[in-house]
């Protein structure tokens, strides 16, 4: 069966918020606009200083995040055509009844264009604020149950779970034109993939490091859907695909020397780096983005880590090359089932001169990908 492939666009939800390009994003080029939702960024503030990056001259902090649901509501009334997705709001910081209501609200504002993108949460956005992050997967599954229950019940409901209790709870807000917003989720672990197959309509991997890895995880999602009586092919396969785009080997070498690019290893689990033949500079137990916590990453530890980062390790794990090379690599993921890619050029984090060209490089890669896949 021939699948439709269309890229997605990112809209940064940090200050200063720029909504000036929404007309271009609403033009039909993109499948959807994706809005990240964080309290804390993946980049340590200890190296977000002019000493390490000139990006700090534009923004005093990498953590000036806005609420993605609120930004989505604004985007909903400023656009007419393109779907709008959170990528992703977690089910730790938000009660499922509020997620259910907010999703319906934004879907009405957008006239049926909202995608509720959810995830099980991350350390940096939960632990510093006192949220219980002890059983994120169980809470995630129960949240999806509650959202679906409130949406689909015509009468007040009771629910008793491990995390949530409802007594005569109702959500009488009807869906826009009789259709509930699709739920997409980001995940890679076996249990999460099974949950997504049961409850969700779209999927992003939290990590997929080869086309075969992507295909295997997508097979798990769709297999779960089929086992639970759902149409497996109705689940949209998406991916926030991180890469390094450079016009030359010389430019790539410059990008790899940038501290914020080196710090990308914080997001890579040690077990993944071992698969590519490299030790992780933070040790064998490092779990990637799940372990990012400002409290345990002081400046001294970050600086010591940067000294240990091997550029060859980043090149082994992260796809890289010219826009055309990037497109050819990404085509392998399309052949593995990917339908909605978002090309995320991490090279833009190398500094202002690289950030200035990043969007154009991504666009060139998108154009070449669409040419390759027809």
Regions found by a protein language model. Give the residues of each.
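N-terminal beta1-alpha1-beta2 module of alpha/beta enzyme domains
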Residues: 1-78, 82, 181, 374
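Hydrophobic faces of well-ordered beta-strands that scaffold small-molecule active sites
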Residues: 5-9, 33-35, 84-86, 114-118, ...
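Active-site mouth loops of central-metabolism enzymes
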Residues: 5-17, 87-97, 177-188, 243-246, ...
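Short, acidic/polar
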Residues: 15-25, 99-102, 186-195, 322-332
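A structural motif
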Residues: 30, 110-111, 200-201, 338
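Glycine-rich, proline-tolerant flexible connector loops at the mouths of alpha/beta enzymes
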Residues: 34-65, 90, 122, 127, ...
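Conserved, mostly hydrophobic/aromatic
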Residues: 37, 75, 106, 147, ...
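An alpha-helical appendage that flanks or caps ligand/catalytic pockets
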Residues: 134-172, 212-332, 372-374
């Amino acid at each position: 069966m021939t699948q439709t492939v269309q890229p997605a666009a990112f809209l940064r939800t940090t200050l200063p918020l720029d909504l000036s390009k929404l007309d271009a994003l609403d033009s039909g080029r993109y499948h959807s606009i994706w809005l990240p939702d964080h309290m804390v960024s993946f980049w340590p503030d200890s190296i977000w200083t002019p000493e390490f990056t000139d990006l700090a001259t534009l923004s005093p902090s990498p953590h000036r995040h806005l609420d993605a649901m609120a930004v989505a509501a604004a985007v909903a009334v400023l656009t007419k055509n393109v779907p709008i997705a959170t990528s992703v709001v977690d089910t730790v910081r938000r009660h499922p009844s509020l997620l259910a209501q907010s999703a319906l609200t934004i879907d009405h504002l957008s006239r049926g264009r909202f995608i509720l993108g959810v995830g099980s949460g991350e350390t940096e956005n939960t632990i510093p604020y006192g949220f219980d992050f002890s059983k994120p997967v169980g809470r995630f599954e129960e949240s999806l149950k509650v959202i679906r229950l409130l949406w689909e019940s015509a009468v007040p409901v009771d629910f008793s779970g491990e995390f949530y209790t409802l007594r005569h709870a109702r959500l009488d807000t009807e869906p826009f034109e009789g259709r509930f917003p699709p739920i997409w989720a980001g995940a890679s672990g076996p249990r999460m993939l099974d949950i997504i197959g049961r409850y969700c309509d779209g999927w992003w991997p939290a990590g997929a490091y080869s086309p075969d890895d992507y295909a295997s995880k997508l097979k798990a999602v769709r297999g779960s859907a089929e086992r639970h009586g759902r149409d497996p092919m109705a689940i949209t396969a998406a991916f926030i695909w991180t890469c390094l785009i450079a016009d030359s080997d010389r430019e790539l070498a410059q990008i790899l020397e940038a501290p914020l690019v080196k710090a990308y290893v914080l997001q890579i689990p040690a077990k993944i780096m071992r698969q590519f033949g490299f030790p992780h500079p933070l040790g064998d137990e490092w779990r990637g983005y799940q372990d990012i916590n400002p409290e345990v990453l002081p400046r001294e530890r970050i600086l010591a880590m940067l000294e240990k980062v091997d550029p060859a390790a980043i090149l082994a794990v992260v796809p890289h090359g010219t826009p055309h090379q990037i497109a050819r690599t990404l085509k392998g993921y399309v052949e593995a089932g990917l339908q909605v890619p978002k090309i995320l050029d991490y090279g833009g984090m190398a500094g202002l001169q690289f950030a200035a060209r990043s969007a154009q490089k991504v666009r060139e890669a998108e154009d070449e990908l669409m040419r390759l896949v027809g």
